[in-house]
Amino acid sequence: MNAPAQWHIAVDFGTSNSAAAHTAPMTGAVETLPLSHRSNLIPSAVFVQADGAIHCGDSAISLGRRDPSRLVPAPKRYIGHDQVQVAGQDVPLNALIGAVLYGVLERGRAQHSGENPTTVTLTHPESWSVHNVDMLLSAAATVGLSKDTIRTISEPRAAAIHYAAQQHIPAGSHVAVFDFGGGTLDIAVLRAEQNGDFSVVAAKGDNTLGGRTIDNVLYRWVLDQVEHNDPDTADELKSAEVSVMHSLDQSIREAKEMLSDTSSATITVSTPRGEHDFLITRDEFNTLTDKVVGRAVELTQAALSQAGVDKSTPIYMTGGSSRIPY
């Protein structure tokens, strides 16, 4: 009997979404792992049932519309705690994170005839303490991964190594990683070492700045438009049911993503009173998000200054929010 084919996976457990790459079954080439029918991302959200069963990703979001008290949208934000209170119950944080890892690994196994990966690489923020990294390892253990198969690496180092595989970075030179995700912004300046690895020489970040910040700015803009055009609908929207707000959140995210490629987009507000469509142009979007972008630029300049490098240092942009044109 032939031994099972070896395969490897790397998982980026994010604040809002998680992603993964694996070695393809047929070629062994490193490829992005599809995590749903429509995306290479999976929401990092989890839903805890009354019986303790934990769902992750899109199913967690769906269940959370019916009972928001049992939804944890961003388990990563609880790093540093051992327990998270969900609907009056204390739930181990490693179980919540483990549920997300399990969801990702199941999709990987489905691509590899149900076999477990030979190695698993887990990324984490540069600023995490040993205790925080141990929590990630503990979460991996809850889904049956043995410690000797797991490697951890900081997110900026992983990004720099990926960038260096595409662009030559001479030893001793620097590269900046601008990681603008759904929930956080992290900037690091790294120096290329002789052995091909990278060391972080400066880092800045904001754990409250991300794609959701921009979503909130757009929500306030929509509310202003509704109040101007239909005050009664605005009052209704402020106390709307979860399903109404979810629909609006989705429309806002879709419009934000469309503005990366088009000069305008429509945000739809659907309530029992009817539908309202609001057109937003890219110029309006840029004006609305000017403070967010300004803060991101400020942090980037601070990181470059701290590292003692100039503006000619290459910047590798990663994270979904980095795709937004500014």
What are these regions (language model features)?
Residues 127, 175-176, 205-213, 239, ...:
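Alpha-helix capping and helix-loop boundary segments enriched in small/acidic/polar residues
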